[in-house]
Amino acid sequence: MAAGRELVVSFGEMLIDFVPTVAGVSLAEAPAFLKAPGGAPANVAIAVSRLGGGAAFVGKLGDDEFGRMLAAILRDNGVDDGGVVFDSGARTALAFVTLRADGEREFMFYRNPSADMLLTADELNVELIKRAAVFHYGSISLIAEPCRTAHLRAMEIAKEAGALLSYDPNLREALWPSREEARTQILSIWDQADIVKVSEVELEFLTGIDSVEDDVVMKLWRPTMKLLLVTLGDQGCKYYARDFHGAVPSFKVQQVDTTGAGDAFVGALLQRIVKDPSSLQDEKKLVESIKFANACGAITTTKKGAIPSLPTEAEVLQLIEKA
């Protein structure tokens, strides 16, 4: 990671989540919906900024009311939107989210195609990407061309400029043509990443084994990686670095909505790594950073919606002190 740079650049989709006003009902039974800005890479960028870090977003939005609203939300939250482009021929993506009684989610997407899928390599803000200390992305941008090619090119540009590459696959099975295609494409860029974060569900999906034991996790380890993380919801997180591995417990909170918790975790961790890259080699520092990220994720589950519930540094430190 190049010295003196503290910018996290997030690449991918930003969309509108429609969340039912009542938890525990199907989409058809929901009496009404609240619109909430979402999209994992955008959530990560805002999480970084909310914590006082430098963040930018690269992606495509529809040249429509929702797209303009989302760009304004990035700016209002201190995220550099110099990498955002608009498409007059496609709409901003929508997702209808079912909140089960336990706060977990199910999704129904409207993308045929949506603007985020139509970003081309020529539309990339190369200078912005080159400034990244960390370049973060998911796998949804790998599903369709031309966005897939733009994604691969952006990774190349960032890597050549000295950025750490951070990958959260953020599996959304409903968006892929098949489970096999999802697995193949998600793993197609696995070897390039420096930092990878997966959930329990993604670990099972990618390995075919329903276990979080070390030998299963190590199937996803690559010698080129600096850090592999497995998030375990309210059970905390397991971490694997070149010279050490372990687990960090979570914080007990009253969960309302898990939307954005993983993104808050990633944003918090990346913000800490950018501030002190040596934490990737220093277990004590890394554990402190993961603890901070766990607290950030936990707070995010205590309110509805991702972006409104992303905490400030003061709120995170308050939870850590209370615990």
Curated annotation (Swiss-Prot):
Documented activity regulation = Inhibited at high fructose.
Under the cellular component aspect of Gene Ontology, which terms does the record hold? cytosol
Q: Which reaction does it catalyse?
A: D-fructose + ATP = D-fructose 6-phosphate + ADP + H(+)
Q: What is this protein called?
A: Fructokinase-1
Write out the entry's keywords from A to Z: ATP-binding, Carbohydrate metabolism, Kinase, Nucleotide-binding, Transferase
Q: In which tissues is it expressed?
A: Expressed in stems, at higher levels in roots, and hardly detectable in leaves.
Pfam families assigned to the protein according to its UniProt record, in alphabetical order? PfkB
Source species: Zea mays (Maize)
| Pathway of action | Glycan biosynthesis; starch biosynthesis
Q: Name one GO molecular function term.
A: ATP binding
Gene Ontology biological-process annotations: fructose metabolic process; starch biosynthetic process
UniProt superkingdom: Eukaryota
Q: CDD domains per the record?
A: bac_FRK
Which EC number(s) does UniProt give?
2.7.1.4
Can you tell me which family this protein belongs to? Belongs to the carbohydrate kinase PfkB family.
Among Gene3D superfamilies, the record links this protein to:
3.40.1190.20
Biological function: May play an important role in maintaining the flux of carbon towards starch formation in endosperm. May also be involved in a sugar-sensing pathway.
What InterPro entries does the annotation carry?
A: Carboh/pur_kinase_PfkB_CS, PfkB_Carbo_kinase, PfkB_dom, Ribo/fructo_kinase, Ribokinase-like
